[in-house]
């Protein structure tokens, strides 16, 4: 029934298995891949006919995690998977980015890649094996895909690179880098680092590229046994159309790209396009070429004109040389009620970034395959259509917004203080108000400033820069702080974020082969210079965190109590903790470890709640005198509430210096008294005394009573002696 083909290899100390022919046989390509006990199914389906009226590759990648993969049932009311989680969106992008450049130019058939996590061993993250499985499925499918690709995760532990570290091993790593590419070239890098130098980052990229070569070889062996016949597809030859477009529009395009203002430049380019269309594909009359063909050729000519100009003259679209960063203006404290805010403007790219501090109640619960955990640092990126002078859809964030937000999150996250040092939930929101390239890096810069404005003690300011590359044969130009047009028309887009000490995040997307390690090294060194310049410009607004939190931010006080005292603070059914919250107005978060966070914008409320809790958990000292209240009387004594919520017994013999016949002769319920803590009996019961305390002054009269008893005994002794004489 099944024609199963299989490849196995030992990779990074664990077995990688690729299998096809048994599951999802109606898909164009399907591979079940296992790494350790993490298993995914990758499928590819591409329509037989192209999608009419489009000028882009209609590729969709969907990565989906199933709760059963980790032996869990989804939370929520419906108990089934719903909309994609942030991780599913991010991994979908991680798979998409290295495979998209490898489709043959001109492929317009709707293509969908679906990767489903079937099993998760909680050791091997499914993202790497998902990328490998998707690559294998595409290679088998027959679509014009110029792969395969390999992928690997690289950690950095004890100054040594580590291939595909487990989830547990990653906790001790100062680097989390994912790299993907073909046999000959790196195509994609995504990373977070703890201020590592550029040479370590580049070394990690090359280490990963070297060590995923066996995976590519295994996919090729599998394809030799199981690949489908390649689709019959011939890309459209645009050379004749391009020649015609160049003759009509080259001079005008060169003039259009001398305009430094984005909207003016776009208007000029549109005018050239209209002229070319009217000449080569008029709406009325005889057309020399198909309209769609002319549009595609015009895009190619646009790119060539810009690229030639940069390589020939060293001058860019907006007149800068290749190393110059656009003018920067940084402002902080721009919103009066926000906890921290910044407006970061770099050329025609602008981000309004706001930092908000919250309490434990504001932590985000993440329901992942590895289990539910809390996230205390949130960074959200919004890209409204007005930022590029357009109208468009508004609503929930798209994949691009989630991806850019996560990139900025990775850049800032390594600089945040530890939770025990700064026990706040932090949310940063970046509103992109203008965009002409590098808005994610503007978000990094604005986030750094907004956090410092809020009083968050970042270890150092962090900045980011987007770099580009133009490569033609042996000639190349690395571009600092790229514009949107340079991003689209260039061969490499990579973003570097970091501090004066090192890199915290590196994202790289390479569109062509031929980019060598040396070119990447030049680009990273140039990015370092650009980052240093940006940090200097940011320092004009703020150099470090403000010494105090923002005026409207909540204050949080932390305290540690013994874990066996947590029940006493909470009380039966939460009675005690509710009373503290209601009477002080403070927010209180109690953790299983005994850490208590008390939050309020009012310092007096924090102090009142702190003292209340301290009185509950503190132990009374033997020999000390405390105020108390009679809560119950019995024949043998009275129970006194003292020292917060503690109750102890004053035995009838300890009520008063004189003999007491009846407890109620001395005290009644509700009486305010002063008691001395004598300690605990062998059963742990608290023993108190009233008779050794002056009920008026609170003075300890133990010695006075001893002296009186001694005097009484002396008088009795003298009386006996006198009677005997």
UniProtKB/Swiss-Prot annotation:
Chain residues that bind Mg(2+): 487, 493
Positions of region (Disordered): 697-725
Residue ranges of domain KH in the record: 554-613
Cofactor(s) needed for function: Mg(2+)
Subcellular location: Cytoplasm
Biased composition (Basic and acidic residues): 701-719
UniProt keyword Nucleotidyltransferase present: yes
Family: Belongs to the polyribonucleotide nucleotidyltransferase family.
Name listed for the protein in its UniProt record: Polyribonucleotide nucleotidyltransferase
Protein's organism: Methylobacterium nodulans (strain LMG 21967 / CNCM I-2342 / ORS 2060)
């Amino acid at each position: 029934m099944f024609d199963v083909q299989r490849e196995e290899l030992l990779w990074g100390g664990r077995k990688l298995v690729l299998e096809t022919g048994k599951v999802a046989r109606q898909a164009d390509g399907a591979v079940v891949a296992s790494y350790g006990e993490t298993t995914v199914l990758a499928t590819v389906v591409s329509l037989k006919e192209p999608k009419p009226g489009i000028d882009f590759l209609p590729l969709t990648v969907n990565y989906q995690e199933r709760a059963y993969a980790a032996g869990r049932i989804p939370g929520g009311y419906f108990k089934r998977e719903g909309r994609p989680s942030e991780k599913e969106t991010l991994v979908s992008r991680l798979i998409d980015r290295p495979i998209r450049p490898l489709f043959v130019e001109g492929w317009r058939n709707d293509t969908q890649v679906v990767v489903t996590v079937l099993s998760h061993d909680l050791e091997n993250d499914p993202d790497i094996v998902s990328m490998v499985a998707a690559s294998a499925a595409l290679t088998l499918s027959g679509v014009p895909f110029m792969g395969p690709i390999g992928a690997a995760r690289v950690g950095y532990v004890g100054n040594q690179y580590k291939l595909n570290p487990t989830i547990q091993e990653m906790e001790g790593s100062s680097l989390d880098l994912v790299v993907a590419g073909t046999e000959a070239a790196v195509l994609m890098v995504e990373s977070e680092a703890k201020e590592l130098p550029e040479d370590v980052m580049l070394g990690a990229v090359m280490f990963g590229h070297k060590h995923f070569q066996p995976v590519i070889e295994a996919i090729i062996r599998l394809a030799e046994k199981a690949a489908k016949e390649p689709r019959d597809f011939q890309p459209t030859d645009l050379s004749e159309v391009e020649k015609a477009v160049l003759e009509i529009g080259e001079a005008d395009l060169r003039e259009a790209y001398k305009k430094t203002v984005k909207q003016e430049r776009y208007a000029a380019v549109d005018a050239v396009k209209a002229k070319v269309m009217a000449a080569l594909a008029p709406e009325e009359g005889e057309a020399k070429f198909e309209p769609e063909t002319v549009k595609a050729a015009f895009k190619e000519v646009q790119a060539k004109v810009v690229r030639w100009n940069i390589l020939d003259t060293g001058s860019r679209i907006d007149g800068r040389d290749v190393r110059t960063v656009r003018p920067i203006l940084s402002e902080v404290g721009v919103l009066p009620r926000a906890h921290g805010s910044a407006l970061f403007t770099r050329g025609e790219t602008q981000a309004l970034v706001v930092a908000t501090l919250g309490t434990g109640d504001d932590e985000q619960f993440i329901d992942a395959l590895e289990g539910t955990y809390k996230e205390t640092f949130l960074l959200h990126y919004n890209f409204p259509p007005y930022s590029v002078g357009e109208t468009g859809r508004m609503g929930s964030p798209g994949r691009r917004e989630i991806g850019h937000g996560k990139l900025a999150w990775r850049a800032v996250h390594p600089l945040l203080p530890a939770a025990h040092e700064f026990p706040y939930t932090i949310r940063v929101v970046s509103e992109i108000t203008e965009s002409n390239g590098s808005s994610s890096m503007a978000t990094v810069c604005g986030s750094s400033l907004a956090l410092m404005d809020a009083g968050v003690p970042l270890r150092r300011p962090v900045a980011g820069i987007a770099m580009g590359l133009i490569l033609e044969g042996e000639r190349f130009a690395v571009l600092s702080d790229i514009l949107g047009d340079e991003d689209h028309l260039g061969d490499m887009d990579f973003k570097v974020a970091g501090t004066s000490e090192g890199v915290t995040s590196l994202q790289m997307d390479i569109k062509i082969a031929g980019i060598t390690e040396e070119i990447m090294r030049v680009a990273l060194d140039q990015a370092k210079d650009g980052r240093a310049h940006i940090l200097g410009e940011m320092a004009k607004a703020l150099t470090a965190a403000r010494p105090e939190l923002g005026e409207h931010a909540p204050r949080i006080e932390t305290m540690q109590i013994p874990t066996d005292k947590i029940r006493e603070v909470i009380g039966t059914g939460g009675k005690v903790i509710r009373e503290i919250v209601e009477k002080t107005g403070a927010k209180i978060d109690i953790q299983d470890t005994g850490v208590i966070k008390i939050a309020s914008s009012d310092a007096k409320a924090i102090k009142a709640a702190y003292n209340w809790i301290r009185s509950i958990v503190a132990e009374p000292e033997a020999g000390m005198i405390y105020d108390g209240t009679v809560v119950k009387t019995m024949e043998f004594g009275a129970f006194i509430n003292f020292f917060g919520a503690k109750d102890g017994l004053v035995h009838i013999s300890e009520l008063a210096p004189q003999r007491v016949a009846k407890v109620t002769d001395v005290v009644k319920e509700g009486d305010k008294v002063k008691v001395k803590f004598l300690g605990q009996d062998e059963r742990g019961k608290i023993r108190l005394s009233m008779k050794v305390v002056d009920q008026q002054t609170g003075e300890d009269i133990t010695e006075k009573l001893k002296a009186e008893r001694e005097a009484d005994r002396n008088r009795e002794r003298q009386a006996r002696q006198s009677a005997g004489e």
